[in-house]
Amino acid sequence: MSNVGIIGGADGPTAIFVTSALPRMLNPWGMAIILLMMIPNVIFALRHRNMENRCKSRFINILEQIGRYGCFILMIICIGLDKFGFGSVEDFLIYLFGSALLLLAYFIFWILYGRSPSRKKALALAIIPCCLFLLCGVTLRQWPLVVFSMLFCVGHICVTLS
């Protein structure tokens, strides 16, 4: 197993970067994104243990969960590819910096929401992960991740608005 990943197309490698010693179908960046996203969610869940889901639609709740867990799995495991990788340096940079900016926005909105909860902030906290999953799916050309991100988006926003 190699610790070097190559970004490039049919005309040859465009760039070489060091990756983890994980199997090539695992996405170490996706693992980090999921772990970072979960930090404020776990803190919130521990502080609000008795909070109930106000969405009474079983269909919407199931749709959200299918989308959520599909995104979590596909952010970490690249299905349908023989290895994890990007089509170009640009894809990698968009993925890296776009994800970083969306995570930063997510953390900022969690801080703002923690200080004074509001519907608008809750909606931002629902939309940002959807955008993050969609960005990752498109830049990695992981079309199943794009599909699951859309399912999650519809379900998560509906649950948040209820």
Model-found features: residue ranges?
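Membrane-interface helix-loop junction between the first two transmembrane segments
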Residues: 42-59
